[in-house]
Amino acid sequence: MANLKEIRDRIKSVKNTRKITEAMRLVAAAKVRRAQDLVLRSRPFADRLARVLESLQSRIALESADTPLLQARDPRHITLVAMTGDRGLCGGFNANIIKRTEQRFAELKASGYEVALITVGRKVDTYFQNRNYPITASFTGLDQLPTSTDALQVSDAVQAEFLGGATDRVELIYTKFINLVSTKPVSQTLLPLDPQGIASPDDEIFRFVTKEGELGVERSSASNQEDKLKSDLVFEQSPSQLLDVLLPLYLQNQVLRSLQESAASELASRMTAMNNASDNAKALAKELTLDYNKARQAAITQEILEVVGGASAMA
């Protein structure tokens, strides 16, 4: 059994570690609430933009519009946009995206496509850089609570590659926020934009709520939103001109939403991981305290036996 000093040092170390993990859990919980505020502030613009596009879609055949972002090509070159965080200590959040990206990359290569990556986040960038994957652009050091400026950087790079002919299709791989204890890596086609996917019934928005002192999440369908545009609304510009302006905004908004969901997932994963670490540290400290008490009791008993033995020898 370890001596008393070693056990005391371990107990002190575990308790100090628990203070750190508990502080990180509280910070993550606070940032999750701030992530909610970002989503709520950006939602009115996103909703209005989707309704304008929906109104245009109902008046013209978007498939026949001469708009580059809508033009589907015979894909030969495909770009994967993978989103992780810049830091660790968030459970399997980063590893799950890296694994899914590797699998998708291998699937596409096996099917004969030329595949490249755009990385968002230091973890995914470092991983694939070290393994010499073809990376055409990388974004690190973005705000932990993503803004439209962050999304614009990514969407501009994606749009430039697509319009320049460097890629025929862009797929986005990120973590979908389900609730505070559950997230899911998902992938979706980002470009070419699908006009039928605008304001689809499956499009969900999430809102963080507090109920009975516990932080939770509510999801609602975008199709349930009210305030539709009036059917007699007149657009002065031609449909093609409007689409050339609005579709890049829609692309940026799609990227922003993915960044925000990914950030919320990272914060929730970190909060859960640090909560588990704090619980484990508490249990370990309790176990070490029991070991310390046993060792101390054994030492006292041994001293008593030595005293008794010495007294018996002198008698």
Swiss-Prot record:
The gene is atpG. It is a peripheral membrane protein. The keyword Metal-binding does not apply. One of its GO terms (cellular component) is proton-transporting ATP synthase complex. Keywords: ATP synthesis, CF(1), Hydrogen ion transport, Ion transport, Membrane, Thylakoid, Transport. HAMAP family: ATP_synth_gamma_bact (MF_00815). PANTHER family: ATP SYNTHASE GAMMA CHAIN, ATP SYNTHASE GAMMA CHAIN, CHLOROPLASTIC. The keyword Membrane applies. F-type ATPases have 2 components, CF(1) - the catalytic core - and CF(0) - the membrane proton channel. CF(1) has five subunits: alpha(3), beta(3), gamma(1), delta(1), epsilon(1). CF(0) has three main subunits: a, b and c. It comes from the Bacteria. The lineage of its organism: Bacteria, Bacillati, Cyanobacteriota, Cyanophyceae, Synechococcales. This is ATP synthase gamma chain.
